[in-house]
Amino acid sequence: MENKQKTATTVKVSPGPLGYVYARRLPPEGLTELALLSARSADSDTAVLPLIAGLTVESGFDVNVAVVVGSRTTGVGGTGVSLKLMPSHYAPSAYVFHGGRHLAPSSAAPNLSLLCDRARVQFGFSSFKPKPCEAEGETTGEALCEHLGLNPNESLLYMVIAEGFKEAVYISNTILHMGGVGTVTIAGEEVRRIPIYPLQMFMPDYCRAVADPFNDRHRAIGEYFAYPLPFFNAKLASLLFGAAVGPAAVALRARNVDAVARAAAHLAFDENHEGAALPADITFTAFDPTGSKAGHRNPRECGGGFEQRLASVMAGDAALALESIMSMAVFEEPPTDIGTWPMLTCQESTAARAASIGAYLGRAAGLVGAMVFSSNSALHLTEVDDAGPADPKDPTKPSFYRFFLVPGTYVAANPQLDRDGRVVAGHEGRPIVPIVGGNHEFTCEHLATLCGFSPELLAKMLYYLERCDGGVILGRPEMDTFKYVSDSAHTDVPCCLCSLDNRHSCAHTTLLRLRARHPKFTSTTRGAIGIFGVMNSAYSDCDVLGNYASFSAIKRMDVQETARAIMQETYRSAVERVMAELENLNYIDAAVPTSPAKLESIITGREALQTVVSNVKQVVDGEVAQLMRALVEGRGFRFREALGEANHAMSLTLDPHASVPCPLLQMLGRRSNLAVYQDLALSQCHGVFEGQAVEGRNFRSQFQPVLRRRVLDMFNNGFLSARTLTVALTDGACISAPGLVSGQHAAAESGFEGDVARVNLGFPKEIRVKSRVLFAGAGPAASEAARARIAGLQSAYQKSDKRVDILLGPLGFMLKQFHATLFPNGKPPGSDNPNPQWFWTALQRNQLPARLLSREDISLIAFVKRFSVEYGAGNFVNLPPNNISELAMYYMANQILKYCDHSTYFINTLTALIAGSRRPPNAQAAAAWAPRGGTELEAQARSVVANPGDHPGAWTTMFASCNLLRPVMATRPMVVLGLSISKYYGMAGNDRVFQAGNLANLLGGKNACPLLIFDRTRKFVIACPRAGFVCAAVSAGSGAHESSLCEQLRAIIAEGGATVASDVFAAAAKSLGARVQQLQIEDWLALLEDEYLSEEMMELAGRALERGGGEWSLDAALDVAREAEAMVTRHVDAEETFDFGAFAEDGPADAGLAVHLQSRRRPLACSDLFGDAPAEKRNDLTLDML
């Protein structure tokens, strides 16, 4: 990844308040949409809303603002006062503190507030406790409604606040300017809004948080200033304590949540603060990373070393400082406007709009499930471990990887230690649970911790988990919710949150249903971080060969040429030309390049298939030859060497408004960013500690600025792409604010002078993620550990010489889809249905009667075999094509690899697991949404399934895989992926630290996503498209390996044979039982990645139901499977059979007419089906070849 120099850009922003309190009557329309997008617990009157133009704020709302953060004395003797402005942006969430009960709760789970309070106590986090003076001076929602002339029982009050100043509202450092009430229009309704300003306005030159805001005699108050009443609302403060401060406190390991809020507020007001912000008495968790002697070791032995604890707090402090810098960022993209959402533009009724939103949130549930159940998710990486010095012989030698994040979810209840490793008061006698080993159980309290102990975010988390699959698609036993609820009426249930009537929707029941997917931590070694991010650009280098022959790589510095001319000779443009030509040939649909629908009208016979394949081959060969000639002759491009530097690459934005409008998804993005910031900071800690007396009391305050500067110096060094802005006020800007003498109830004054405190602003803009295309092996300078690790990978990347089944080869997808058209006589004896598995298995085993083949059949077989053998000999993509687009892209990549003399190893490939949604397939899936439980649960759940239109949120998540990642990335999706950040110095003598964000995989396998498989040559990205839904479409490790049903079925397919369909169905029936009848065609596609087999599975399932008289029976299913097997294995009389093995690969088609008598014998293994392959040719590249 090339290093881009910082460029300064001038942006102009308008001055404005810290935020607004919006007061509105309940909207007559859109309340259901608002409820679906919000996060609200059933036992709370508060909620968190997404900031959406046209729904929660007015259309045209500008998120970038120069907020008033204080005042300064000016003039001779300090007699004048000007306002201090700070660039910022409004937070992507709005906070409802009155009237939230009018919004339908995100989940019907009961007593979530009680659960969060209980979890806080269990894990040692502080609770919300307002001060007596705050309670006395509280501004209630009812009082505000009365002041504005609104009915308190029919009104909604919520706050929109600038990022970085939420904590200031929590600690009562703001005021409501009651004299500045204005009116705006939202969705055709008039809405009142009250500006929010800081108390520091009335304290000139006071650039820090006010510890006692209700003290109207504070000595910092300006002379003759009318000190206002600080804004405190108990419901709002409690909401911010959980939803805004709580997630940060958990991520930073700070048990004192109030102290985190005050530290963040101080950083917001004091832009020059560079020292420590977190308190000196912060505590640390004792944990045993090895898992030995769990529960019996001395807590001081499990607290790690002093430097480990110091690195933990200093990295947390640095991450908080980075987040404060990000709060001052100015972003280009405006907030999303619900009126422009493509998925709503064609919906006329309110119910249809709500159903579209519900369907989209059902998609996002797949990503939330991956973040919760992946064992290396940023949500779980909350503790810091020490790997020790890199060189045991030289402990002072700095290492970027000494300190790293480890999962802390299951050790959160361990004893807390002080700075010196002593157990703090109140934690004596607590057991020490190891990170790995032990009998860990993922409980509701752990889930509350992931949400920062916020009932609102926890309710939204349960909303998504209720839509996740519990393991049906994997063959795992899933809990029968109906039976569980029914039995609980007579048995003891280990849950004090629910009763029989609401047990079906309880958080405990949801986690029990998903028990098979609970995270399991098997290692504490440093590894990848599972993060949630958003692609905000349609551009990515995710073609098969990534950014090979990119614009910057082929540009000649000695020649003046246009950018268009350079771009036309890149690999990317060559790919686009191939795809455009396939579209012109009507082979693919540009909107959905992976769809096989176009070919159905083209392949009407044998010649048509040969024409299609020949045309694809001709188009690709021509483009590759043209590309290589341009690179070699025209540019002198070192095409072989460049292949080793090629990477798949994408960028994830740090713009908080880019997330799909949902408070929980925004929290996932924030937690991911905090994990990344801490990873960077931890890499610099050892260098800061080197040669210093770290035990000194003043060390942290003295060296925290050093660590902060080191982290900031890592910007624009390959991973964190930063942007430098020069901020100025808009021309003719008028600074309006409450009068300092007239007070908060007087009208605003507009005669203020003011200036921007930070004119030059540098902040991270995006993170770059890449994956190397080639497996390079160990270099000569690699360490012994690296060589050993690489040696273990070589076998996974080694290209096998074994021939593959024709149906698993390059043309397999077409041969299966069009078998009935191509070989109408290719059906088992006694059957009327053509069967490709039987036909090609019998053909390759020399068991197919020659009388069944015509001259045209043999000609097509010769063509298929020749192309398959030729493709296989030079194939280095460890994936069979599933459609014509993949065939063209894989063949193109292999041709370029052939020019580059690549051999031996497969290349790395990318796969997108695209989240989708569907209505609940059965009553069990809808149990959590039943209006009534108890004895009526099953009937109510069946009613939800039968009447989906009455339940807009009744959707469940599903997945489909796609091996063409570039069109997926063009939808600017939300993604969940594994990220491993490597750090290294530049050239010799250069102390500049570069980084690379390497794409890795999520740990946890099927727990994270049902379609994840263990394949070292593949990297997976879980994606949920945004373009076409909520934004406009743009034109064109070491986890445990789990053997699941998905892998079993694909192993059966990989083995090949005539009985593939019957074997797959029998295996699925034995594993899933009655759940087979619930699988839809999408489920079979996800399991098998084979459209033909998926349709056959649906047919066999239907026949099994008919055999059982409408009821599912395993015996009937197995009978159907045996009949299908018998149909394709029926023996034929001894006669002449077609000798496929002796069939000439390079000879004329007529050579296949020679047949030989074959005795009945045991079929050969698939690896013996073909003759010897032609020797691989590795000639040097010549102009003649080009």
Swiss-Prot record:
InterPro entries: DBP_sf, Viral_ssDBP_head, Viral_ssDNA-bd. Keywords: DNA replication, DNA-binding, Host nucleus, Metal-binding, Zinc, Zinc-finger. A zinc finger (unnamed) spans 495-508. Pfam families: Viral_DNA_bp. GO terms for biological process: DNA replication. GO terms for cellular component: host cell nucleus. Residues 1160-1186 are annotated as: Required for nuclear localization. A motif (Required for filament formation) lies at residues 839-840. Belongs to the herpesviridae major DNA-binding protein family. Homooligomers. Forms double-helical filaments necessary for the formation of replication compartments within the host nucleus. Interacts with the origin-binding protein. Interacts with the helicase primase complex; this interaction stimulates primer synthesis activity of the helicase-primase complex. Interacts with the DNA polymerase. Interacts with the alkaline exonuclease; this interaction increases its nuclease processivity. Plays several crucial roles in viral infection. Participates in the opening of the viral DNA origin to initiate replication by interacting with the origin-binding protein. May disrupt loops, hairpins and other secondary structures present on ssDNA to reduce and eliminate pausing of viral DNA polymerase at specific sites during elongation. Promotes viral DNA recombination by performing strand-transfer, characterized by the ability to transfer a DNA strand from a linear duplex to a complementary single-stranded DNA circle. Can also catalyze the renaturation of complementary single strands. This is Major DNA-binding protein. It comes from Bovine herpesvirus 2 (strain BMV) (BoHV-2). The lineage of its organism: Viruses, Duplodnaviria, Heunggongvirae, Peploviricota, Herviviricetes.
